[in-house]
A protein has these predicted regions:
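Residue-level detector of functionally pivotal "anchor" positions at catalytic/ligand-binding pockets or at interdomain
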Residues: 258-260, 734-759
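Beta-rich accessory regions
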Residues: 262, 494-519, 525-737
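C-terminal tail/sorting-segment detector
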Residues: 771-782
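Short strand-turn-strand beta-turns centered on an Asx-Gly dipeptide
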Residues: 184-187, 693-696, 759, 775
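Extracellular glycan-associated modules
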Residues: 24-51, 57-260, 265, 593-611, ...
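Bacterial Sec-dependent N-terminal signal peptides
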Residues: 1-24
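Terminal processing/anchoring signals of secreted or surface-associated proteins
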Residues: 1, 463, 738-744, 760, ...
Length: 782
């Protein structure tokens, strides 16, 4: 884009009566490439700080770098010298790409939009300055103060909305002589107003706002009148450019797709951000839904707020992966914009029907929810087209809640189930595809029997055929006495499409006792490929909003689990085999009698895999991880009472479970191993999440937030003599395809002279730049 702006200089030459007239010099030029957190005006050479809670991020612009705005915390206040700005003729040109629109005021209907200032120094009280603004509905407007009548505020409203997910050029031209102020989008005039042939007024003491309105409008601790996306260039000219010149300038703007993903540098000093678990590059996520496979990749769609790590005006995010552990965020798939989904695009499902991929989602306006439909424009599932409403609201006789559609087919019939409640008990409606449309007569697919045990409303229903006539039905109920957790039934689909469980009482998806009050894996998405049934779900971090604000993100997904049904009708869960490809050459393998503690050095850090097989005797056995001189996390099994416990009570951490677990997650194993039998513990640690598998049968995921940089050591232990076979690896999500291990350490190694990064991975030498750990202490290399 910088080259386009160079062309602007040349094009700003006009011919009047055969005489070449050189346009005035630029009044300001901000190329938005930040250095040391500062941007520079190329005209005045003044520098301005980028206000940001996290490290300032440059990303690729159209030409050179653009500044990334996160939609809730970062903006610029620039004291540009308005004494050099013309009062009679002005052109403002901005190259930008919006990921989303500014957040609406969640306390009001969306008919009252929020505006964010893209660039301007407008003083509404004194009617001085100007501002180009973007609304929460995508509308653009130009406002400016004029000398008319001792100060008058003019507005030029745009008639077209700014398109998200692409580069745009927004241009404003103010021309006193022609008595017109015009607003352009990508070279097309979309709005104008008269300006009473009056001078533009400026307030010399008023700073320019970039990416935020001058006021602070918040939802909780998050700013909402802020811009989310990229700004590449801002140029102010003391010249009124013609419409032809503006159109020519804008002709090259959409030459490339913007990449909104935050660079890794944003989280370089984070101890908590997972590396091989699915999640967006920033902002807020919740339920992942609609896992599918297309064009050589797995795709997971999810609830996303790009404008900050908090829940509001939901979009459908999209991540993809070739291996289910190294993830890339794709552009937003579905965004609010139609009358029926203006308040949010909530959860639903992705399914293939006649080799066509489809999305069904919950569309929410200011008063109700409907089920809407969308189809992809490409095999990569990047761009989607909305197809309108598929099911027009909830049938009568149900609770007000009606959301989260899920598609399945049985006996040649196509069905959709939708979460709801009936008579105070959770249920799902059943909709059958007949004569080109979905029925909506209030039929119930399945309903619980007790609101306290089964919830009063069911979120995120899922139906998966598991073979041998058996179906797996999962839901995440609200209103349960135990708080939010995911439960499941196994049963059959009847000829009319309804469901009959094998047992009236459901089971918990997570090992019993570990998941309650919204902890653990929730609302799974399930996909079948190559004979495997793969499950993953959201694992909320349960942190206060202020902590999420400082982190820049909220929540992530579990590791993929392979599930099946045992002969006794229970669900079996084990880690997906392909996760082995992350194993590095830093590893340990030992088989011996163990009594006491044994270091697993050099395997240490925050991205590790621990695999232990214990011959059950007496006492306790298990693993220590995140160990330092002052504490540790402990996973243990007590052979005397069959208790499996994950204990964080001595771990220095940011507590996220007070009042629910208080650092101790315990349960009695459903099948207690007897003396002489084997107990298998398989643990994956990724910074702030642990995925734990027991005997390739039970699983659970837990969040923890260690605060000490020295918490990196690992051990295996037993309080009485036991035979143990243990393997451990450091993991690296950048690895792919190879599961070979080149070196096996059979003896504990001294790590005091070794160097590690913040993820706990061993470095061959001191890095030239960044944070590293040596001898248990933190250093910064510049």
């Amino acid at each position: 884009m910088k080259n386009v702006l160079k062309n602007l200089i040349a094009m700003a030459m006009t011919v009047v009566a055969g005489t070449t007239v050189i346009a005035q010099q630029k009044a300001a030029h901000l190329d938005m490439s930040a250095a040391n957190g500062m941007i520079t005006d190329k005209v005045s050479q003044l520098q301005f700080s980028v206000n940001s809670q996290l490290p300032v991020c440059n990303v690729n612009g159209l030409d050179g770098e653009a500044l990334r705005f996160d939609g809730y915390s970062n903006y610029v206040e620039a004291a540009l010298p308005v004494s050099s700005f013309s009062k009679s003729q002005l052109t403002i040109s901005i190259v930008l790409a919006a990921e989303t629109y500014p957040m609406m005021n969640v306390a009001e209907a969306e008919y009252a939009p929020t505006y964010a200032t893209i660039f301007g120094n407008l003083d509404e009280n004194t009617r001085e300055g100007f501002a180009i603004e973007l609304s929460s509905q995508g509308n653009l407007r130009l406002r400016f103060g004029s000398a008319y009548a001792n100060g008058f505020l003019f507005t030029a409203n745009g008639t077209k909305t700014l398109q998200c997910g692409r580069w745009n050029m927004v241009t404003a031209v103010l021309d006193k002589n022609s008595n017109k102020a015009s607003l352009y989008l990508n070279g097309e005039e979309i709005g104008s107003c008269k300006m009473s042939r009056s001078d533009i007024r400026y307030n010399a003491s008023k700073t320019f706002m970039i990416g935020k309105d001058e006021t602070d409008l918040k939802s909780g601790c998050f700013l909402i009148n802020t811009f989310c996306g990229l700004i590449d260039d801002i140029v102010v000219y003391n010249e009124s450019l013609t419409s032809d010149k503006i159109a020519q300038m804008a002709s090259n703007v959409n030459a490339a797709k913007p990449d909104f993903n935050y660079p890794a540098s944003r989280y370089a000093e984070s101890l908590w951000r997972p590396q091989f678990h699915g999640m967006p590059s920033g902002g807020w996520t919740n339920e992942c839904h609609g896992m599918t496979y297309s064009d050589g990749k797995y795709h997971v769609f999810f609830q996303k707020n790009a404008n900050g790590p908090y829940m509001a005006r939901l979009h459908w995010g999209h991540i993809s992966s070739e291996n289910l552990y190294k993830w890339t965020e794709e552009p937003i798939a579905i965004a609010p914009g139609e009358a029926y989904d203006i308040k949010g695009c909530w959860s639903g499902c992705v399914f293939d029907d006649n080799n066509i991929t489809n999305i069904l989602y919950t569309a929410v306006d200011n008063g109700r929810a409907v089920i809407a439909h969308a189809t992809p424009e490409d095999k990569g599932l990047v761009s989607w087209t909305k197809q309108g409403i598929a099911i027009n609201g909830r049938p009568s006789g149900l609770s007000d809640d009606f959301r989260d559609p899920y598609f399945f087919s049985a006996d040649g019939n196509k069905y959709v189930i939708v979460g709801t409640g009936k008579d105070g008990i959770g249920a799902c409606t059943l909709h059958k595809y007949e004569n080109g449309s979905w029925t909506n007569d209030g039929r119930i697919f399945f309903r619980g029997t007790n609101g306290n045990q089964h919830g009063t409303f069911w979120e995120m229903p899922n139906m998966t055929y598991m073979g041998n006539g058996k179906w797996l039905f999962t839901v995440t109920p609200l209103g349960m006495g135990s708080g939010v957790r995911t439960i499941y039934w196994i049963g059959k689909v009847n000829g009319d499409g309804t469901f009959t469980p094998d047992n009236d009482q459901p089971k918990t998806l997570e090992i019993n006792g570990i998941s309650k009050d919204g902890y653990g894996l929730l609302s799974p998405t399930i996909y079948q490929k190559d004979g495997k049934t793969i499950l993953l779900g959201i694992v909320p971090d349960k942190l206060p909003s202020e902590v999420n604000s400082s982190m820049g993100w909220a929540h992530n997904y579990s590791l993929p689990r392979e599930i099946s049904i045992a002969e006794n009708g229970e669900l079996i869960q084990k880690p997906l085999e392909s996760l082995k490809a992350m194993r590095t050459d830093v590893c340990v393998e030992k088989s011996q009698e163990l009594f006491g503690e044994m270091s697993l050095s050099p395997v240490c850090g925050r991205q590790i895999e621990l695999l232990g097989e214990f011959t059950v005797g007496s006492g306790e056995m298990g693993f220590h991880f995140f160990k330092s001189a002052n504490g540790k996390a402990t996973l243990s099994y007590n052979t005397n009472n069959g208790m499996l416990t994950l204990d964080f009570t001595t771990l220095a951490r940011r507590s996220n479970d007070g009042g629910s677990y208080n650092g101790v997650y315990s349960t009695v194993l459903p099948d207690k191993p007897m003396p002489g039998e084997k107990l298998k513990m398989h643990v994956f640690i990724d910074c702030s999440i642990a995925d734990i598998f027991i005997n390739d049968k039970w699983a659970y995921s837990v969040r923890m937030f260690p605060t000490n940089i020295e918490q990196i050591e690992t051990e295996v232990f037993a309080t009485s003599p036991v035979e143990v076979s243990v393997k451990a690896w450091t993991l690296d999500a950048e690895r792919s395809g190879s599961t070979s291990v080149k070196g096996i350490f059979t003896d504990a190694q001294d790590t005091q002279s070794q160097i590690f990064n913040l993820a706990g991975q061993q470095c061959p030498s001191i890095p030239q730049k960044g944070v590293f750990i040596k001898n248990g202490k933190k250093y910064v290399a510049n």
